[in-house]
Amino acid sequence: MMKKTLSFILAAFMLLSGSALAEEAKAPLSIAEQGMFSAGGTVTGPVEGDYDPTTNWLDATRAGNTAHVDHANVLYQIPVNDNGHPIVYLHGYGQSRMGWMTTPDGREGWATYFLRNGHSAYLVDQPGRGEAGAQASMSTDGFLDVWSEDSKEYKPGDQAWYTHFRIGRVAPERYEGSQFPEGDEAQDQFFRQMTPNTGNFDQAKAAAALGEVMAQVKKRTGNKSIFVTHSQGGAVGWDVPVENIAAIVAIEPGGTPQVGSEQYNRLLEAKIPIAIYFGDYIDNGPEDIASTGFWKQVRDGALDFAEHYNADGGDCTVVDLPKIGITGNSHFMFQEMNSDEIAANIESWLGEHGLN
C-alpha cells in the first residue's frame, strides 16, 4: 500500500511539475506598446470632374476623388524587455502577416517567439495584400492571381500549393517524417491563411513601401531592423533599400540576387549579413514532381550566391536544415511542429552577429 501511495505521489508531482513547466513556457507576454501604421504608398490624382459633396458616394463616376494606395500596413508589438534589435517580417505569395503570428495547430508563431526574446515585431502586409489592399492599378476582376481572366469564377489552388510547398505529394497526405501539423483541423487552418492579391503584384512598389517601413522603424526605435522574409517576400527583400537593414534572414526565398548585379553590389557594399534557410524534401523529394527540381535550383542558386558573396568580403550563411540534423520541414518551417528549434538556430546566428 505504501508503495502504491508513493507511486501516486510521485506521479502527481511529475504531473504538477509538467504543468508548472508548461505554464512557465506560456508565461504572459509583457508588451510595453503595440499598434498599427501604414508606410509608403502614393495618392492618385483626382478623377476628372468636380467633387460634389451633396451626392458624395452616390456619384458612381467618383469625380474629383483621390485614393491613398500602394502602401504597406504594419502591426507592431514592443516587449517590455526590448533588446534594441527589431525584426520586420515580410510574408510570401498568397500569405499575410498572419503566418508569422500563429501556426495551423494554434501554437505561438515566430513573431511571439522572438518577442519573448526581446525583439520588437513589425509585421507587414505588403501593398495589395491583407490590410494593405488599396492599389492604384487594380486588375479587371480585382483578384488577377487567383481568379480566371475572363470571369469571376474562382481558380482553386489548395492541392497545387500543398504539393509545391513540399508538405506532401497530394493533400492531405504528408511526407514521411513531416513536421507539418497533423490533422484535418490544422490543414483547414493552413489553407484558410491563403489570401489573394487585390491586383497585379508590383515588386518595385512593394520594395519601395518596405523601404518606408524600415525608415519608420528606424525613426521610432533608433535602430536598424533585422529583416525576416519568406518565399516571394525574399525576392522583394533583395530590392529594399539597405540603409536601415541590420541583417537579412531569408526563409526559402524564391531566388537570390545575380552575382555582380545591382542588388548584389548594394548588399555587399552595405555589409549586410545574410542567412538563408532551406527545409527538407529537396534532395529527397519525388523526382517526378516539377517542384522538386525547382527547389533544387533555388537552393543551389543560394549556395552559389553565398560562395561569391563570401569570397567578395560579404557574410552569407546557407542553412540546409537536414544537413544540421533538423528534418521534416516544408516551405513553411516557421509554422511546423519544430518551429521553435529553427527559431533558436536563427537566434544563435543573430547572436553571432551581435543582434540579440
Report residues per predicted region:
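N-terminal cap/lid segment of alpha/beta-hydrolase-fold proteins
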Residues: E23-D82
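Short beta-strand element of the alpha/beta-hydrolase
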Residues: G84-G92
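Active-site glycine-rich loops that stabilize anionic/oxyanionic intermediates
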Residues: H91-T103, G254
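Conserved alpha/beta-hydrolase
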Residues: R107-G133
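Conserved acidic catalytic loop of the alpha/beta-hydrolase fold
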Residues: A204-S225
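Gly/Ala-rich beta-loop-alpha elbow adjacent to hydrolase catalytic centers
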Residues: V228-G237
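The feature captures the conserved acid-bearing segment of alpha/beta-hydrolase catalytic domains
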Residues: A250-L321
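Catalytic active-site module of serine/aspartate enzymes centered on a nucleophile-bearing elbow/loop
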Residues: G328, F332-N356
